[in-house]
Design a protein with these regions (language model features):
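Short linear sequence elements within intrinsically disordered, low-complexity coil regions
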Residues: 10-11, 20, 57-61
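Mixed-charge, Lys/Arg-enriched low-complexity segments
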Residues: 39-72
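A short, structured beta-strand/loop element
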Residues: 13-47
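Negatively charged, low-complexity tracts enriched in Asp/Glu with abundant Ser/Thr
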Residues: 1-10
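Broad hydrophobic/π-residue packing in well-ordered secondary structure
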Residues: 11-12, 67
Length: 72
């Protein structure tokens, strides 16, 4: 089941045990990243995709903590 991490600057960030998704709330464009940071799907341009891959690296430890709390 997909869980909501947060919404910031009209970007909704959600996660499952296997992936993290960044979705633009205005356009519904999104990038879906596997836990290792590889792109599963993206309809953002390359620049935005790379931006969210970098952002993913910065927040991944927090998402991992959320996953741990979810399992309690």
């Amino acid at each position: 089941m997909r869980k909501e991490f947060c919404e910031k600057d009209n970007i909704l960030i959600t996660y499952t045990e296997n992936d993290v998704c960044f979705e633009d709330c205005k356009t519904a464009d999104a990038v879906l990243l596997a836990n290792d940071g590889t792109v599963i799907h993206s309809n953002f341009n390359n620049e935005k995709t790379e931006y969210y891959k970098d952002y993913f690296k910065r927040i991944y430890s927090t998402i991992t903590s959320f996953r741990s709390f979810d399992s309690l």
